[in-house]
UniProtKB/Swiss-Prot annotation:
EC number: 1.97.1.12
Membrane-crossing residue ranges in chain numbering: 46-69, 135-158, 175-199, 273-291, 330-353, 369-395, 417-439, 517-535, 575-596, 643-665, 707-727
Native source species: Synechococcus elongatus (strain ATCC 33912 / PCC 7942 / FACHB-805) (Anacystis nidulans R2)
A Gene Ontology BP annotation from the UniProt entry: photosynthesis
Name of this protein: Photosystem I P700 chlorophyll a apoprotein A2
Length: 734
């Protein structure tokens, strides 16, 4: 007899109902719970899967390069990045009638194509690619790399090549290699590419495989490096009149600290970027030699942690016990990694638009909007995952004995204070912000907009002024020509930075007013409420006053029956489930704010945001409704245009989103009865009754229905907004 899915759990494989399939999918990646799993095998499986993950990423990027080289217009775009629309790939669709074929034959193509809004053209252009041949070479290189990583993943699953558990637990060696090897060395390699290939290309000199060993990236060669005369590499930078991609106005510097932006491309100076990566490389390569391995020199992380113990004893045992706890818990490690990655992804979103690194990308408004929204959404999900795995750590891996009176134990002991403070902050922010919005909404509706309560964000304006914004008249730090901060920075990044921040042409520290003040506090409400739910879920995961033995029930459980009233909805998984709704709510407000404010800046119509963003109807009417009109007209009685694909996606996103509620607002018994009626009808219908099934159909469990509902809600939510965002921006700016 063939073994049934799932092979990793004999219990589930023998389940006679459709529960087998659902629970099989739900626990497929929960390796710890699989039959016969040992700790060593667990680490080996996860390690091997990393190679597969990298192979998929390289294959994906290889596909991007290949399709742009084959079907795109990279060479034409490179000649005129500001006016040619970049093509992602061709569309072959047998459903297209003549109207659709005409509508999607765009961007200078001779047949239907998709326009690229990912920014890859700008990236490849900035790093020195100019021809389709360059793209094909990159594609083939990544394809080979992908195959190598797949082989490495397979190899590390073979008995002879499986690392031992002690190898995985050797934290110091891993840190050294990851810091120096992965971060440090790769940053150094990237600096090398920028200096040897990208910067010469930006100055009109092509460097390829044929001449890169004979072309000096700097006229002085390596002499200044070996003589310690490093400042030579910063002398003679590109001038303000430099035409990117040509020798006109170009300098010879390779490592600079000019500050501000290249006047023509409105992107960071390539020589500044190279300098930044070199600095990162040096720091991380040094950091990768800090930790003690079998040579007996350097820091021991365990000793460092155990030394973190305030002498007066006011904070208990400090960090004692953390080394073993962290080193023995994959969930703890994953939670910290996800928290860090979530923060850095959100920072990427903020910096991509305020300090664009790629040439001419600042003028491709749809791409800027897409990249901001994309990174902010991803950051949202990753941060939620950090708390989910933090909660799983506390349930499965936390040992109260090993952590007696240390920082972890003390956080758990005063969790009530933490949770109640978060609750108070959320209530305060929610009632005050909503109160202001509703008040303003009412007085505007009654025709007396002058009665609005409008609060200037003076503290935020002060922070902007400290960074050099002169608009507000605060005489502080960089906004004061005579301050110590200004004097200290004058020789390096200052004049250029001040020009950029005050020019009105960049997205650096946009002017802010009462509308920004209100939406900032709405976002703060969303962030604090999401955090409250996630923190409470994790801190109560092991037990609460209501259910002291909660940890024995695992990460997700529906209820402990009617005998213990009120134990439904209190598992750590339920907290994660609820938090994702709040997180989506918050990222919605963040992206609405960013998009509307920037739309008005790009259109030269900032007054619209300033006047309409202070009351609710302004957001609904002047942002959502007004900007959806072009999108909704993608199809109309007169035919179709190139927004129709987004129009369709907008409708489809709403459908998926609404379907989510069918799973979220439902009760098991109803579905069970319905299923049994359908089965009855099926068995009595000719033809239909020829097909039978081995699994007895049963309704989804409470937790399953929630995860299916949440998945539909989430996917529908961001498909709807993605279509709105891209169509409303592209409809205005192409």
């Amino acid at each position: 007899m063939a073994t049934k899915f799932p092979k990793f759990s004999q219990d589930l494989a023998q389940d006679p109902t459709t529960r087998r399939i659902w629970y099989g999918i739900a626990t497929a990646h929960d390796f710890e719970s699989h039959d016969g799993m040992t700790e060593e095998n667990l680490y080996q499986k996860i390690f091997a899967s990393h190679f597969g993950h990298l192979a998929i990423i390289f294959l994906w990027v290889s596909g991007n390069l290949f399709h742009v080289a084959w079907q795109g217009n990279f060479e034409q775009w490179s000649q005129d990045p500001l006016h040619v629309r970049p093509i992602a790939h061709a569309i072959w669709d047998p459903h297209f009638g003549q109207g659709a074929i005409d509508a999607f034959t765009q961007a200078g193509a001779s047949s239907p194509v998709n326009v690229a809004y990912s920014g890859v053209y700008h990236w490849w252009y900035t790093i020195g690619m100019r021809t389709n041949g360059d793209l094909y070479q990159g594609s083939i290189f990544l394809l080979i790399l992908s195959a190598l990583f797949l082989f490495a993943g397979w190899l590390h699953l073979q008995p002879k090549f499986r690392p031992s558990l002690s190898w995985f637990k050797n934290a110091e060696s891993r840190l050294n290699h990851h810091l120096a090897g992965l971060f440090g060395f790769s940053s150094l390699a990237w600096t090398g590419h920028l200096v040897h290939v990208a910067i010469p290309e930006a100055r009109g000199q092509h460097v390829g495989w044929d001449n890169f060993l004979s072309t000096l990236p700097h006229p002085a060669g390596l002499a200044p490096f070996f003589t310690g005369n490093w400042s030579v590499y910063a002398e003679n930078p590109d001038t303000a009149s430099h035409a990117f991609g040509t020798a006109e106005g170009a300098g010879t510097a390779i490592l600079t600290f000019l500050g501000g932006f290249h006047p023509q491309t409105e992107a960071l100076w390539l020589t500044d970027i190279a300098h930044h990566h070199l600095a990162i490389a040096v720091i991380f390569i040094i950091a990768g030699h800090m930790y003690r391995t079998n040579f007996g020199i350097g820091h021991s992380i365990k000793e460092i942690l155990e030394a973190h113990k305030p002498p007066a004893g006011g904070l208990g045992a400090g960090h004692k016990g953390l080394y073993e706890t962290l080193n023995n818990s994959l969930h703890f490690q994953l939670a910290l990694a996800l928290a860090s990655l979530g923060v850095v992804t959100s920072l990427v979103a903020q910096h991509m638009y305020s300090m664009p690194p790629y040439a001419f990308i600042a003028k491709d408004y749809t791409t800027m909007a897409a990249l901001y929204t994309h990174h902010q959404y991803i950051a949202t999900f990753i941060m939620c995952g950090a708390f989910a795995h933090g909660a799983i750590f506390l349930i499965r891996d936390y040992d109260p004995e090993a952590n007696k009176n240390n920082v972890l134990a003390r956080v758990l002991e005063h969790k009530e204070a933490i949770i109640s403070h978060l609750s108070w902050v959320s209530l305060f922010l929610g009632f005050h912000t909503l109160g202001l919005y509703v008040h303003n909404d009412v007085v505007v509706a009654f025709g007396t907009p002058e009665k609005q309560i409008l609060i200037e964000p003076v503290f935020a304006q002060f922070v902007q002024a400290a960074s050099g914004k002169a608009l507000y008249g605060f005489n502080v730090l960089l906004a004061n020509a005579d301050s110590a901060a200004t004097a200290a920075s004058l020789g390096t990044y200052l004049p250029n930075w001040l020009d950029a921040i005050n020019s009105g042409k960049t997205a650096l520290f946009l002017p802010i007013g009462p509308g920004d003040f209100l939406v900032h506090h709405a976002i703060a409400l969303g962030l604090h409420t999401t955090t409250l739910i996630l923190v409470k879920g994790a801190l109560d995961a092991r037990g609460s006053k209501l259910m002291p033995d909660k940890k024995d029930f695992g990460y997700s459980f529906p209820c402990d029956g009617p005998g213990r009233g009120g134990t439904c909805d209190i598992s750590a998984w339920d907290a994660f489930y609820l938090a994702v709704f709040w997180a989506l709510n918050t990222v919605g407000w963040v992206t609405f704010y960013w998009h509307w404010k920037n739309l008005t800046v790009w259109q030269g119509n900032v007054a619209q945001f300033n006047e309409s963003s202070t009351y609710l109807m302004g957001w609904l009417r002047d942002y959502l409704w007004l900007n959806s009109s072009q999108l909704i007209n993608g199809y109309n009685p007169f035919g179709t245009n190139n927004l129709s694909v987004w129009s369709w996606m907008f409708l489809f996103g709403h459908l998926i989103w609404a379907t989510g509620f069918m799973f979220l607002i439902s009760w098991r018994g109803y579905w069970q009865e319905l299923i049994e009626t359908i089965v009855w009808a099926h068995q009595r219908t000719p033809l239909a009754n020829i097909v039978g099934w081995k699994d007895k159909p049963v309704a989804l469990s409470i937790v399953q229905a929630r995860v299916v509902g949440l998945a539909h809600f989430t996917v529908g939510y961001f498909l709807t907004y993605a279509a709105f965002l891209i169509a409303s921006t592209a409809g205005k700016f192409g």
